[in-house]
Amino acid sequence: MFNLRTLVTLEALIAFAICQDMGILNYQNQNYEAAEKYYNSILSTDSDNSEAHFGKGSSLFMQDDIKNAEIKFNESLASSETLLKSKAFYNLGNISYKNKKLNDALQFYKKALELNPNDDEARYNYEFIKYQKDPEEKKDDEKKD
């Protein structure tokens, strides 16, 4: 089953965020508001910190603040870290899927896979949505006939 809540990951953030362990700890303990506040404190002094934008986006997503999570994931794309960008694209794919924008979701998962071909979750989601779209496209074709 395609479960967005379990698919939003902080793997990339964990890899980059030795100094941000309080945000990760709060996130892992499902204390998303505290994690968000922690990332806000980082961003108040370092507004270009892509890892903090990503962490805040993940925290916002888990609080169902999808619109602001999307903004933060887009801001984290400024990172030079390939793995972080891949995870940001992955999470933007999750948001697009949640918003029923399947074509956008496919494009985001594709970008995630281009940056990280070993991302099995992105590959699974990409294939899952392609499979979902195929019956829809066949119905549209039948309506035209």
Describe the role of every protein-language-model region.
Residues M1-V8:
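Bacterial N-terminal signal peptides that target proteins for export
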Residues F2, N31-S41, N68-L77:
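Repeat-mediated protein-protein interaction surfaces in helical alpha-solenoids
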Residues V8-A15:
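Bacterial N-terminal signal peptides
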Residues F16-C19, D48-H53, L84-K87:
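Generic helix N-cap/helix-start motif at coil->alpha-helix transitions
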Residues I18-T45, M62:
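Alpha-helical segment of the N-proximal tetratricopeptide repeat
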Residues S41, D46-N49, T82-L84, N118:
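Short coil loop/turn residues that delineate tetratricopeptide repeat
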